[in-house]
């Protein structure tokens, strides 16, 4: 007998004709007491009491927020999602309300396309042909292959792929496969991330860390300048940044200037001024602003003398060449002899010189100024240089380490100190960049420290032979140059085993050899920490909303079973004799030691969330350094802000770099490859940049129908460029370059600079990879490059040149 749920009945469409039929049937029933409706049993069942419950959980995808969810459950199914309803919702102790992604989470949980059983690949990688197997066969296959590869190639041949589909949890997290591998000798690890590879590398040389003031500190500023920062789409929820920016600006009435190729949602209706800029040229703008600040005597010279190295001749390191300091570079007195004037920058950025002068004077006269940058500008082929150049504006004006100022990077967050599931120490010290794993599969033994950024040794001894792919669409969808990656993964004699653990048959899952069905975090117990939470830290104790359906299992159980098969010592080291529930209680207790006012475990199951305010009201990056640089030096060789980096000068002299790959000891502007002035523009005249789309978090939520309908996947194109190509809004267009091509709808809009196009990253690949390979899903990585950036060896996924044609 088919069971109809209340929700299904509510969704059913009722036409006038069907309503009349039902009414007639009802009249007939009244006329005959012997008549029994065929659905009368269902009606009686519906009248019977059904047990309902509500549990606290969280949305834990990689948006930088961790929003509280109240999941209402009936018949072991989530049928209604609330968000944070706790407290009085006063700013500073506000409710952590989810955005539309988190509020649609029941559609992910109840999605018919979720993985249900363990499977093994029976076709080619990427075909998506699998057959169902038992858990024992799956776990035995994984364990046998892992044991064989460790024996034949060593631990350096195993890699855990970057993945953030399950990111904010504690035990529902990539820490679990890390811990397993560290329990059995270690693995080839990585440095950097697809989010922040270039800026994290660059700031480590400049400040010794990548840290900024919390966004609530905008309440203390006079001016907000955002370079490529778009929290209204990337971190738009109550657990994110947009609410803080709005509330803080209400208190300070700060003027806000947005610098971005797109008129993004953060700008829309909120900004005082939008300055559209060519992608990848923010560094040139920053240098021209610096020229105005220096020539008009608006720099904070005492700050530069006391806290910095390399601004001028006085603080230039003794081993540096003469006139190698920043001031000389800006004024044209350095080796290149080019003054970085507003007129020079106007030709590069497309921002008029008079606008640059006006902006510079605003920055120089606003005391303090909150200068920040999102992670978009650094995700270019010159991203390391760009991020340092922007940060220099905060340094020049003395806005570092003070209330209302910032270090020039993305806004930071106070951390209350959640105890994390320990990964254990990795005995293997060799590392590769997060972005170069395809090279490590394809030609790993050719990768060196000076050409490919290998760390821990001069070169890799073995290629990657075993790949863990947990909650990761990076295997194909989120990695640069999909066509190249497809070719690398086709040869299964290179990477001999790929284990996927996921919720859906994503584009990446189709390339796995063994595929395991994971429970979602909302179906498990976990201790979840805030991330982009401003000055209000919080922790969520999530409880499972429903039972495990079909043969889905939690990752901790899966890897405990693998550990058991690898031997009793591995199993004991991995589990320490604890179940997942026991780990959560342990981690809660350790967190409570740091925060005694946090509710105990049983009480927190009821309250769901614990919130705590930053004791200093606002989090200020590098405050201690500013107050006493001798007692609190930065983690740089000099202990100061290194405007001139001797370490970068040495790297520039010793690394193997191509002509268009520049590492500079100063925060100088460098064009980068595949940029606005690349000769390739003669063939592919339009710059293409990516952006984080509000319908998805990377590729998470990319298969939710209501979000797809609300936010269709489109390529943004300016009316001038569209008219030249005969393109109208809504037309299907062909976007292509040497890397690949896609068919996608055109969004013709003046909200993007002429000569520039944009596609929201994270859309699911829909291409016949064994046919024409034309993508119909709008995955930007069919067009991006797998060539890494010079210093961080990170993903330059916003540096692209394309042509667009009407289909």
Curated annotation (Swiss-Prot):
Q: What is the lineage of its organism?
A: Bacteria, Pseudomonadati, Pseudomonadota, Gammaproteobacteria, Enterobacterales
Question: Gene encoding this polypeptide?
Answer: ynfF
Q: Name one GO molecular function term.
A: molybdopterin cofactor binding
In terms of NCBIfam families, this protein maps to:
dmsA_ynfE (TIGR02166), selenate_YnfF (NF041884)
The UniProt entry's sequence similarity note says: Belongs to the prokaryotic molybdopterin-containing oxidoreductase family.
Q: What class of enzyme is it?
A: oxidoreductase
- Tell me, how does this one assemble? The complex consists of three subunits: YnfF, the reductase; YnfG, an electron transfer protein, and YnfH, a membrane anchor protein.
**Highest taxon listed in the record's lineage:** Bacteria
Where along the chain is [4Fe-4S] cluster bound? 59, 63, 67, 99
Which cofactor does this sequence's record say it needs? Answer: [4Fe-4S] cluster; Mo-bis(molybdopterin guanine dinucleotide)
**EC no.?**
1.8.99.-
Q: Does the keyword Iron-sulfur apply?
A: yes
Protein name from the UniProt record:
Probable dimethyl sulfoxide reductase chain YnfF
Keywords assigned: 4Fe-4S, Cell membrane, Iron, Iron-sulfur, Membrane, Metal-binding, Molybdenum, Oxidoreductase, Signal
Q: Name one GO cellular component term.
A: outer membrane-bounded periplasmic space
């Amino acid at each position: 007998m088919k069971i109809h749920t209340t929700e299904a009945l509510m969704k059913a469409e009722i036409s006038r004709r069907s309503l009349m039929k039902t009414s007639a049937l009802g009249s007939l029933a009244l006329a005959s007491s012997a008549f029994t409706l065929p659905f009368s049993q269902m009606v009686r069942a519906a009248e019977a009491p059904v047990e309902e419950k509500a549990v606290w959980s969280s949305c834990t995808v990689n948006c930088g927020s961790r929003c509280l969810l109240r999941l209402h459950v009936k018949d072991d199914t989530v049928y209604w999602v609330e968000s944070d309803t706790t407290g009085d919702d006063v700013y500073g102790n506000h409710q952590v309300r989810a955005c539309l992604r988190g509020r649609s989470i029941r559609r992910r949980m109840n999605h018919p396309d979720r993985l249900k059983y363990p499977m093994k690949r029976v076709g080619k990688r990427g075909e998506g042909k699998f057959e169902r197997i038992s858990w024992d066969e799956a776990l035995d296959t994984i364990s046998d292959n892992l044991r064989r590869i460790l024996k034949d190639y060593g631990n350096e041949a195993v890699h855990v792929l970057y993945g953030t589909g399950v990111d904010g949890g504690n035990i529902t997290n990539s820490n679990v496969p890390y811990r397993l591998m560290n329990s059995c000798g270690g693995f080839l690890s990585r440095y950097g991330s697809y989010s922040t590879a270039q800026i994290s590398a660059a700031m480590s040389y400049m400040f010794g860390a990548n840290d900024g003031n919390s966004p609530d500190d905008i309440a203390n500023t006079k001016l907000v300048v955002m370079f490529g920062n778009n929290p209204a789409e990337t971190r738009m929820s109550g657990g994110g940044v947009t609410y803080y920016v709005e509330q803080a600006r209400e208190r300070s009435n700060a003027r806000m200037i947005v610098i971005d190729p797109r008129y993004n949602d953060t700008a829309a209706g909120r900004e005082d001024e939008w300055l559209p800029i060519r992608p990848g040229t923010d560094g040139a703008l920053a240098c021209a602003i610096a020229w105005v600040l220096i020539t008009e005597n608006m720099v904070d010279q005492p700050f530069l003398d006391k806290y910095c190295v390399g601004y001028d001749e006085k603080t230039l390191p003794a081993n540096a060449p003469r006139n190698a300091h920043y001031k000389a570079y800006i004024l044209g007195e350095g080796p290149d002899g080019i003054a970085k004037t507003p007129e020079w920058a106007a030709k590069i950025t497309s921002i008029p010189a008079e606008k640059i002068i006006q902006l510079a004077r605003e920055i120089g006269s606003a005391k303090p100024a909150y200068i920040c940058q999102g992670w978009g500008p650094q995700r270019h082929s010159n991203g390391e240089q760009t991020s340092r150049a922007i940060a220099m504006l905060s340094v020049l004006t003395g806005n570092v380490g003070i209330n209302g100022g910032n270090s020039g990077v993305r806004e930071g967050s106070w951390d209350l100190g959640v105890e994390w599931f320990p990964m254990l120490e990795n005995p293997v010290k060799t590392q590769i960049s997060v972005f170069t794993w395809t090279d490590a599969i394809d030609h790993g033994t050719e990768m060196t420290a000076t050409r490919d950024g290998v760390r821990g040794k001069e070169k890799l001894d073995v290629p990657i032979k075993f790949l863990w792919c947990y909650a990761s669409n990076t295997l194909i969808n989120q990695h640069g140059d999909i066509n190249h990656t497809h070719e690398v993964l086709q040869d299964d004699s290179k990477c001999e085993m790929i284990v996927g653990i996921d919720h859906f048959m994503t584009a990446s899952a189709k390339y796995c050899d063994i595929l395991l069905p994971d429970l979602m975090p909302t179906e498990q117990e976990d201790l979840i920490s805030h991330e982009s939470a401003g000055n209000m830290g919080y922790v969520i104790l999530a409880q499972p909303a429903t039972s495990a359906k079909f043969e889905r299992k939690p990752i901790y159980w899966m890897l405990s079973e693998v550990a058991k098969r690898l031997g009793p010592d591995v199993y004991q080291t991995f589990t320490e004799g604890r179940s997942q529930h026991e780990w959560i209680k342990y981690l809660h207790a350790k967190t409570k030691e740091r925060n005694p006012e946090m509710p105990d475990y049983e009480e927190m199951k009821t309250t769901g969330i614990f919130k705590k305010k930053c004791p200093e009201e606002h989090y200020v990056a590098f405050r201690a350094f500013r107050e006493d640089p001798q007692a609190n030096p930065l983690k740089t060789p000099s202990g100061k802000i290194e405007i001139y980096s001797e370490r970068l000068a040495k790297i520039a002299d010793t690394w193997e770099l191509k002509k268009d790959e520049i590492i500079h000891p100063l925060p100088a502007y460098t064009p980068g490859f595949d940029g606005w002035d690349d000769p390739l523009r003669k063939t592919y005249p339009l710059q293409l940049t990516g952006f984080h789309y509000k319908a998805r978090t990377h590729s998470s939520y990319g298969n939710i129908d209501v979000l797809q309908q609300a936010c269709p996947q489109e390529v943004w194109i300016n009316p001038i460029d569209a008219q030249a190509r005969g393109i109208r809004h809504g037309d299907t267009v062909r976007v292509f370059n040497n890397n690949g091509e896609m068919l996608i709808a055109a969004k013709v809009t003046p909200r993007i600079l002429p000569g520039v196009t944009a596609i929201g990253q994270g859309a699911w690949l829909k291409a016949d990879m064994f046919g024409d390979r034309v993508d119909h899903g709008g995955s930007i990585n069919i067009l991006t490059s797998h060539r890494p950036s010079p210093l961080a060896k990170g993903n330059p996924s916003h540096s692209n040149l394309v042509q667009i044609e009407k289909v």
